[in-house]
């Protein structure tokens, strides 16, 4: 467990961890895989769109989780970010508390496509979400786009400024999420293990330990 948590938090090379724990790199690799498999099974699932309060006001943004670019997974490359990774959709309230993190999708997935795939707006109205220009057309509160040869009006600029002030909280929350360095620096794990690691962190972020130990009756 200590090895796996250290790996997720610091994204150290497995050879480095092998030196720290006086063992071999294959042993470190097996330990990480075994613990990730166990955590993925025993941790409760993270919140789903159906679990969210549809009357709450949210802030929505996407982020790229960088990873190694495997030749057999060309869809991981994000033209927007010019690197390979996985797309995560993050939903916070207007105070910045994270309420939802989507499953990872290939980095080439556009934010609109990614959020549609979650089914989020089957459970709430899109205007309950503030988002950036990448979500224009969904019905969310988004900034006005400047059209060629048509500068924004003063009230539109003020509106955009207000939207950006609201959106700041989700950007800050994503930065806090990426304290897990496996989410902010390219992972060297195989692609299936990388996805499993991301999903384990999603579960850890929402895990609430029982207030009291539970002992089933005979």
Label each PLM-derived region with a short phrase:
Residues 1-10:
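Short, amphipathic alpha-helical "recognition" segments used to contact nucleic acids or chromatin
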Residues 10, 14-218:
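Short, well-ordered secondary-structure "scaffold" segments embedded in the functional core
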